[in-house]
């Protein structure tokens, strides 16, 4: 299905690009989320009429994400969990735990923003983690996993 992107989507394209995606991806995710419209003549004309408004909105979203990136870059976030004698956790530190620690530090983040390429953190130590606030604004933070006092 041919669609017009209404915002920049990583791995797909930029605002205003006409791309071909699978029908289910367009119908079930992109169109209901307001990220795209079908590439019909009427929708193309409507998009061109609203292009400046959409570009301004995207610039505002990117500026907000970059401001949060400035606050977050280089920060150290501490997460405490029960650990055994050998320093391994009974459970693991997930992206939800890290997002909660970031929010506790006073910066807006959701678990979908936290990137853990090697999976959940299972041992005590310090880890470099990326927080993708926008496709063009990725902050690098240090997560210090410590053993909780019992």
Curated annotation (Swiss-Prot):
GO cellular component terms, A-Z: ribonucleoprotein complex; ribosome
Ion transport among keywords: no
Coiled coil, from the record: none
Keywords: Ribonucleoprotein, Ribosomal protein, RNA-binding, rRNA-binding
GO-annotated biological processes: translation
Listed NCBIfam families: L9
HAMAP family: Ribosomal_bL9 (MF_00503)
Function field: Binds to the 23S rRNA.
Protein name from the UniProt record: Large ribosomal subunit protein bL9
Gene field: rplI
């Amino acid at each position: 299905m041919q669609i017009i992107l209404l915002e920049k989507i990583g791995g797909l394209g930029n605002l205003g690009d006409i791309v071909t995606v699978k029908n289910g991806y367009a119908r079930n995710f992109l169109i209901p989320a307001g990220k795209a419209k079908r590439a019909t003549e009427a929708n193309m004309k409507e998009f061109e009429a609203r292009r400046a408004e959409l570009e301004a909105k995207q610039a505002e979203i990117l500026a907000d994400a970059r401001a949060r990136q400035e606050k977050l870059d280089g920060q150290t976030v501490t997460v405490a969990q029960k650990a055994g004698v050998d320093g391994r956790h009974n459970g693991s530190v997930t992206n939800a735990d890290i997002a909660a620690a970031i929010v506790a530090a006073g910066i807006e983040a959701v678990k979908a923003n936290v990137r853990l390429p090697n999976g959940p953190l299972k041992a005590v130590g310090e880890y470099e983690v990326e927080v993708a606030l926008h496709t063009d604004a990725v902050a690098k933070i240090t997560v210090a996993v410590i053993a909780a006092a019992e």
